[in-house]
Amino acid sequence: MRLHVVDHPLVAHKLTTLRDQRTDSATFRRLADELVTLLAYEATRDVRTEQVDIHTPVSRTTGVKLSHPRPLVVPILRAGLGMLDGMVRLLPTAEVGFLGMVRNEETLQASTYATRMPDDLSGRQVYVLDPMLATGGTLVASIRELIKRGADDVTAVVLLAAPEGVELMERELAGTPVTVVTASVDERLNEQGYIVPGLGDAGDRMYGAAE
């Protein structure tokens, strides 16, 4: 597994505003969308392309286009939905799948409650969207499901990560073609499994379900 922390002043600026408890849901959604696009730029650095011949208004030349099969973008429900627009803004021709995961707040274990994606992901580059890499259980379970379906190149785009989650992924997904792209690796998890300093519950803050 490879970890890439994006170091950019705009990323740091938007992340700081997301962390602020005074930021309302509408602003939170907008900033999360903008931040995802910045992270997506780095996450797609190795997106597969193929050579193509074209004619400009002046002459013939050679360029590149995205290869087939098209990349697959998979937001993890529900908070991952708030990251979808920011990702497909850079990959408008990508296919979109959905993966519903829920975490037991007592055991912190993740389980699947819904899937909608191709059964065969052989040869596909897959981009998984989840705001928080906290304990790591949700992302590990999600990526295992994708690899089971044949995905051979998985990139997880997360706004924030905790060291504990990164360590779990490195241990559980050792030797797999997985990259994690994030704006920050924070200090730690608290006893409730939240990232510290973090930004709270990303889903609740996006959709206004809780303070």
UniProtKB/Swiss-Prot annotation:
User: Could you tell me the keywords of this UniProt record?
Assistant: Allosteric enzyme, Glycosyltransferase, GTP-binding, Magnesium, Nucleotide-binding, Transferase
Instruction: List ligand-binding residues for 5-phospho-alpha-D-ribose 1-diphosphate.
Output: R78, R103, D130, P131, M132, L133, A134, T135, G136, G137, T138, D201
Q: Pathway listed for it?
A: Pyrimidine metabolism; UMP biosynthesis via salvage pathway; UMP from uracil: step 1/1
Superkingdom classification of source: Bacteria
Enumerate the residues binding uracil: I195, G200, D201, A202
GO-annotated molecular function: adenine phosphoribosyltransferase activity; GTP binding; magnesium ion binding; uracil phosphoribosyltransferase activity
Show the catalytic activity. Answer: UMP + diphosphate = 5-phospho-alpha-D-ribose 1-diphosphate + uracil
Identify the cofactor(s). Answer: Mg(2+)
Cofactor note text: Binds 1 Mg(2+) ion per subunit. The magnesium is bound as Mg-PRPP.
User: How would you classify this enzyme at the top EC level?
Assistant: transferase
Q: Which GO terms describe its biological process?
A: UMP salvage; uracil salvage
Q: What EC identifiers does the entry list? A: 2.4.2.9
Q: Looking at the keywords, is GTP-binding present?
A: yes
Q: Which InterPro entries match?
A: PRibTrfase_dom (IPR000836), PRTase-like (IPR029057), Upp_B (IPR034332), UPRTase/APRTase (IPR050054), Ura_phspho_trans (IPR005765)
Q: What does the record say about activity regulation?
A: Allosterically activated by GTP.
Q: Which family does it belong to?
A: Belongs to the UPRTase family.
HAMAP family assigned: Upp_B
Functional description taken from the UniProt entry: Catalyzes the conversion of uracil and 5-phospho-alpha-D-ribose 1-diphosphate (PRPP) to UMP and diphosphate.
The protein here is known as Uracil phosphoribosyltransferase
Q: Could you tell me which species this protein originates from?
A: Streptomyces coelicolor (strain ATCC BAA-471 / A3(2) / M145)
